[in-house]
Every structure is written in C-alpha cells, then in structure tokens.
UniProtKB/Swiss-Prot annotation:
<feature type="binding site">
    <location>
        <position position="304"/>
    </location>
    <ligand>
        <name>beta-D-fructose 1,6-bisphosphate</name>
    </ligand>
</feature>
<feature type="binding site">
    <location>
        <position position="301"/>
    </location>
    <ligand>
        <name>beta-D-fructose 1,6-bisphosphate</name>
    </ligand>
</feature>
<comment type="pathway">
    <text>Carbohydrate degradation; glycolysis; D-glyceraldehyde 3-phosphate and glycerone phosphate from D-glucose: step 4/4.</text>
</comment>
<feature type="active site" description="Proton acceptor">
    <location>
        <position position="188"/>
    </location>
</feature>
<keyword id="KW-0324">Glycolysis</keyword>
<comment type="subunit">
    <text>Tetramer.</text>
</comment>
<protein>
    <recommendedName>
        <fullName>Fructose-bisphosphate aldolase A</fullName>
        <ecNumber>4.1.2.13</ecNumber>
    </recommendedName>
</protein>
<dbReference type="Pfam" id="PF00274">
    <property type="entry name" value="Glycolytic"/>
</dbReference>
<keyword id="KW-0704">Schiff base</keyword>
<feature type="binding site">
    <location>
        <position position="43"/>
    </location>
    <ligand>
        <name>beta-D-fructose 1,6-bisphosphate</name>
    </ligand>
</feature>
<feature type="binding site">
    <location>
        <begin position="272"/>
        <end position="274"/>
    </location>
    <ligand>
        <name>beta-D-fructose 1,6-bisphosphate</name>
    </ligand>
</feature>
<dbReference type="InterPro" id="IPR029768">
    <property type="entry name" value="Aldolase_I_AS"/>
</dbReference>
<dbReference type="GO" id="GO:0004332">
    <property type="term" value="F:fructose-bisphosphate aldolase activity"/>
</dbReference>
<feature type="active site" description="Schiff-base intermediate with dihydroxyacetone-P">
    <location>
        <position position="230"/>
    </location>
</feature>
<feature type="site" description="Necessary for preference for fructose 1,6-bisphosphate over fructose 1-phosphate">
    <location>
        <position position="363"/>
    </location>
</feature>
<dbReference type="InterPro" id="IPR000741">
    <property type="entry name" value="FBA_I"/>
</dbReference>
<comment type="similarity">
    <text>Belongs to the class I fructose-bisphosphate aldolase family.</text>
</comment>
Length: 363
C-alpha cells in the first residue's frame, strides 16, 4: 500500500466543503438549467418557439430573475457553457446576477455520451480531454461547482461490469480534476428509467453502481466532504406493469443510499428522471419523512421538474414572463418544502401531473 500524497491543503478542503454545504443548506436544492442547445430545441419545439440564442437567454433570464420567493429555495444553479457568458437585460452577466442572490454557480463539463465498444449498446461519457484547463477557466469565471453525467441502463444483460467500471472511473477522474481547482464535483451516475424491470432490480443495480463509484472515488483520493451525489431515485422501469407507492419508492431509495453512500458526503441531489413535477416533489418529500436515519441532506437537482409548467406558461411570448415565473416559483417552493419533508401535494396545476419521460434520455 503506497503512502498518501495529499493533493489538497486543509484550506482547499475547507473551501470545497463550505461550497457543498451551502448548495444543500436547509430547504435548498439545485436548479439544473444546463440543457444543451439540442435539448432546448426539443423543449422549445413543444411550445412552438424558435431555438435562437436570444430566446434561450430570455427564457433562462426568466428563471434567474424570479422574485425573492425563489431565493431561499435554490442553493445552486447549473449552467450550460453558453449561458455562463450571457447577460441580463440590465447588462449583468448571469453568473454575477445569480451570485448576487446568494446562489452558487455551477457548470456542466461533460461532452456527452459515446458508445462503449463490445457492449450491448452501453455508453461512457467523454470530456476528460482539456478538463484540467477548462476547470481553471471556469473557476476564474465564477463557477464553484460542476456536474458530469454518466448513463447506465438496465436490461437482462446490462449494466455490464465493464460499463460500471469505466463510467465510475471517468466520474472519479473528473471529480479529482475539479477538486484541484476548487470546484465541487457533482457525480451523476444515472441509471435510466427505460425498461420493464421491477423496483427490486433497480435497487440492486443502484446499490452495485454506487458501491463501485465510491470505491473509484476512494482509489482516486477524492475528498468526499467536497462532493455531491446526483443519483436517480429507485423506481421501477417505465414499462413495468406493477405500480409502486411513493412510500415503496422512498424506502427502496433511502435503503440503497444507506448501504452505499458514505456519511461524509454532505448531500444527495436527486435527478427527476422524467417524473412529473408533482411526482418528483412527492417522492422527495416522502424520502425526507422516511423513518430510516439519513446522514446526508436529501434534496433536488431538477431540470424539467422545476421548469415544465413555467415553459408551458411562457410559450415563447414576452407578455407571459410573469406567469412563467409564478409557475417556476410554485415548483421551487414545493421542492423546498419537500426536501424538508413538509410538502403537502396540491395537484392544482395542469402541467404538473404530465409525465416528462423521454425514452433513452440524452442531454
């Protein structure tokens, strides 16, 4: 066993830990606004809006400038590269504006999924090349955390051992590079909801993947107190004939996390995985009411589940800005309560119950 060669000073560790704790402070979660230009195209298509840089700026400005009620609900915002360099109508860069609200600025740094040869349609994630230099630049440009998504899918033959090992190593490598630059890495090993597998199978696979990932993070000397985990909730496959209760989903999820995620990790920020807005809030709420001990904050890092109703209300029309912001604030408040186990389902919004599932989801 070789000696450790510490690559982080106590001050660097403190900075990372402070950032992570700020993002998942009580009642706070993450607004994932890091959809790629291609993903925004799909969202805008659904509201008959042209996918131009200006329309993307206007839409994200609506989210970032929602009134003070949203303030205490959001701990961090994940940006897409383009958005990082856009400005508000008042001429402030988006990162400056977001920071002025006390929200931490984050950036998606992966370059998307690519096929993994010799597997049954499995993938790995690219983007490690040049990441060291990009992190240095992003830190200068105001980013304090980052996100990297890996994708695994459940079939009778997958995820394979190769796919698990490869993706976990990529996540660990990314995490250690971020930490060298004072950036908190969010590690996202998403297990897709596609398939007809039951809840037990998802739980089993989630446990195996998370165990492998934390082993890889340890092998790469990643400082866990300065990381966050962005996992899928443990749900059955979308085509599974059996429908499980929110309580069953919460118990399966918290059990899987308790078996694999070290208590040193400050927070777990769930992805919504195509659940409806309401479902994503209810499941998060029930997890925070779960009778099992939870040593980490359980909160949200939602994209569609914070934005779907807002996007619909906006419809690409300048006059609908206020209505869109109201819908966004409604979801932000709901999830802020849910991550404290205090949410009472309302079910009043038309779009909130719509399923947001997209098969084989790629950002």
């Amino acid at each position: 066993m070789p000696h450790a060669f510490p690559f982080l000073t106590p001050d660097q560790k403190k900075e990372l830990s402070d950032i992570a704790l700020k993002i998942v402070a009580k009642g706070k979660g993450i607004l994932a606004a890091d959809e790629s230009t291609g993903s925004v195209a799909k969202r805008f298509q659904s509201i008959n809006t042209e996918n131009t840089e200006e329309n993307r700026r206007l839409y994200r400005q609506l989210l970032f400038t929602a009134d003070d009620r949203a303030g205490p609900c959001i701990g961090g915002v994940i940006f897409f590269h383009e958005t990082l360099y856009q400005k508000t109508d008042a001429g402030k860069t988006f990162p400056e504006h977001v920071k002025s609200r006390g929200w931490v600025v984050g950036i998606k740094v992966d370059k998307g999924v690519v096929p993994l040869a010799g597997t049954n349609g499995e993938t790995t994630t690219q983007g490690l090349d040049g990441l060291y230099e990009r992190c240095a630049q992003y830190k200068k440009d105001g980013c304090d955390f980052a996100k990297w998504r890996c994708v695994l899918k459940i079939t009778s033959t997958t995820p394979s051992r190769l796919a698990i090992m490869e993706n976990c190593n990529v996540l660990a490598r990314y995490a250690s590079i971020c930490q060298m630059h004072g950036i908190v890495p969010i590690v996202e090993p998403e297990i897709l909801p596609d398939g007809d597998h039951d809840l037990k199978r998802t739980q089993y696979v989630t446990e195996k993947v998370l165990a492998a990932m934390y082993k890889a993070l340890s092998d790469h000397h990643v400082y866990l107190e300065g990381t966050l985990l962005k996992p899928n909730m443990v749900t059955a496959g979308h085509s599974c004939s059996h429908k499980y209760t929110h309580q069953e989903i919460a118990m399966a999820t918290v059990t899987a996390l308790r078996r694999t995620v070290p208590p040193a990790v400050p927070g777990v920020t769930f992805l919504s995985g195509g659940q409806s807005e309401e479902e994503a809030s209810i499941n998060l709420n029930v997890m925070n009411q779960c009778p099992l001990h939870r040593p980490w904050a359980l909160t949200f890092s939602y994209g569609r589940a914070l934005q779907a109703s807002a996007l619909k209300a906006w419809g690409g029309k300048p006059g609908n800005g206020k209505a869109a912001q109201e819908e966004f604030i409604k979801r932000a408040l709901a999830n802020s309560l849910a991550c404290q186990g205090k949410y009472v389902a309302s079910g009043d919004s038309a779009a909130a119950g719509d399923s947001l599932f997209v098969a084989n989801h790629a950002y």
